[in-house]
């Protein structure tokens, strides 16, 4: 079991996708995302294997949840700055975590 203090260390914040494009340099099909986390963090870049259910142009303007306080991680030829969150379907394809109503970019999950 983790303690509540452990949960508090993880920053899960919401941001709006402002750019999305296919990552044609990745081994597995993925989408590069630029996410606006507002004044709190600004814009952050990541890559996620979302092509089963999402087209890049459909993601623009959508709000997504991401872990924002992991250190940057090399993913192929790019550096990922955040980890976008999702739940797996029956085949382990990610379904994004998104708020059902618009919220302020940078808002922290509690």
Specify the residue positions occupied by each region the protein language model found.
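Phosphate-backbone binding interfaces of nucleic-acid-interacting proteins
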Residues: 1-110
